[in-house]
Amino acid sequence: MSQEISARLLPQKPSKWAKILLNRKVPIFLFFLLELAFLVFSYISLQEHFPSIILWEHLLSVFTFLYLLNRSMDSRSKLSWLIIIALFPIFGTALLYFSLADFGVRRLKKRLVEATQQTSDYLATEPEVEDYLPHSDRQLQRLAYFLEHSPAHFPIYRDTKVTYFQLGDDMLPALLEDLKKAERYIFMEYFIIDEGIMWGEILAILEEKAKAGLDVRVMFDGMNEMTTLSYDYIERLHKVGIKAQTFSPIKPVLSTYYNYRDHRKITVIDGQVAYTGGVNIADEYVNKRERFGHWKDTALRLDGSAVQTLKALFLTMWTVTGIEDKRDMEHYLQEKPQQRKSQGFVLPYGNSPSTYHKVAENVYLHLLNTSTNYVYIMTPYLILDDELVRAMTFAARRGVDVRIIMPGIPDKQYAFDIATTYFKALLDAGVRIFRYTPGFVHAKVYVSDSQQAVVGTINTDYRSLYQNFEDGVYLYKNLEVLKIEEDFEKTQALSEEVTLESLSKMPMAHRLGGYLFSLIGPLM
C-alpha cells in the first residue's frame, strides 16, 4: 500500500535528456548565473570607462572596514567579511550591505513577529510549576526565566512523559503507531522529505487519515524541490487530501530570503503527542539506505503538556508560510494537552533568525557554563563562534569532562575539515574528541551531570545557531537524561579518539582546505 502511494506521487520517470532539461535546478542556476554575470560585466565596464573608480573602491573598502570593526558582530564573522571585501572590494561591500539590509525577509520577519505574538498568548508556565520554581535549583530558574522572557515565551512544563530514541530505526515504529491512532489532526514539519520506504509508510497512513476527515498538514523546506521532490509535489499531496506548504521555495531571483531554512523536524498528533530530534523523513535516517555508513541519530517523543510548545512552533511557521488567519491558530492552541505524570522538567523551545536573543546558542552555553562534572556532545558539524570556543575550553580547564563525538564518515568533507581547525585549541584545553567509526553522527545532543540534556535539530554550527529555524527540548532531572548519558557512552565505545598526534597526520589537502574554508565558515 505504502509503496503504491509513494510511486503514485512520483512523476513519471523521464528520459535522461528530458530529466536534464526539465530539472528545476537548471533554469534557476542559469538565472543566478546571468544575474552574477551582469554584475561582473557592469563592474568591468565601470573600471574601463571610469578609471577613478579604483580610488573610490579603496575609499569604500576603508569605510566598510571601519563600519565592520565598530559593528556588534561575532569576530569570526567580521573576519570572514573583511577577507571577502579585501579580495573583492565592490562586490564584497555590495554583498555585505545586501545581506545586512535583508530586503528579502523583511515581510517574513514581520509576519513572524505577528504570529509569535499570537502564540505567546497560549504559552504560559502553569501555576503549580511557577510555585515550585523558586524552591528549585538556581540554574533551572535562570534558564526557565530566560526562555519564558524570550520573544516567543517558551514555558517550562512538568507533566510530560518523555521517551528517548537512540536511533531513527527505533523511533519509526513508534511514530507509525501513533500516526495510526490519530483521531483529529496530524501536523508534520520537516527539513527533508525524500521518497522511499520511510516516507511511503508514513504517507499511506496520512492519506488514510485525510480520507477519514482528519486535518492532515505537511510542510517542508523549499530546498526539497531542488533536491528530493518534484516542484509540483505540493499539488500531488493536495490531490490525496493532504494540506501541504513549502517554506521559502527557491526561485530564480537573488535574495537573502534563501539564506534562512526551516531545519525543524516536528510531528504533532492530536495536540497530545509530539516527536522531534535529528531524524528527517528519508531512508538513510532509519538505516533503510546506506549513505555514509551507519546513521546515528536521535529523537524524542513527548506525551503531555509540553506538546503545546511544539504545536505552537508548527502553527507559527504554517501561518507565516501560508494564508491561514488568526482563528486557525486560536482553534488549535485553545485546547491543552492532557497532563501525564512524570518526573523532572521539560522545556521545548524554538530558534529563529528573526530574533537577536540567540536562544539555541544560549541554551548550549548554559549547559557548558553550569556543568560541574561533565558535558557530553554529539554533533555532525562543529563550526564555532568565539563564545562557544571559550565556553568549551573554560569548562575543560576548570575540570569538567568535556567530550564531543563527531562523524567517522562525514557527509560534507569541507564541513569536517573546518571542524578540525578547532580541534587543537580544544584538545590543548583538555576537551576529548571522538569520531564515530561505524559511520555518520547526525544526532544533536548535549547532556550534562546526569541532570540536564538537550535533544533537537540544532547543530553546533553557525547556520543552525544564527540562520535556520530550529527547535530543541531541554530536559532537567528527567529519567531520560540517564538514558541519553548511557547512549553517549555506548556511542563513544564505538568511536576512535582524536589526538594531537592523529590530527598532525591528517592529509595536507584537508588541513589546508579546512583553514581556507574556515575563513568564510561563518558565512556558509
Where are the predicted features?
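Helical hairpin unit composed of two closely spaced alpha helices linked by a short loop
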Residues: S371, Y381-R403, P407, K412
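Thr-Gly-centered strand-to-loop micro-motif
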Residues: M378-T379, M406, Y436, V455-G456
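Short glycine/threonine-rich loop-to-helix capping motif typified by GTGT followed
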Residues: R390, F416-T420
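Surface segments flanking catalytic/ligand-binding clefts of nucleic-acid enzymes
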Residues: R432
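Glycine- and other small-residue-rich loops at beta-strand/loop junctions that grip anionic moieties
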Residues: F191, Y381, A415
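Catalytic-core elements of nucleic-acid end-processing and repair enzymes
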Residues: K444
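N-terminal localization/anchoring segments of enzymes in phospholipid and broader phosphate metabolism
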Residues: M1-N362, H366, T370, P410, ...
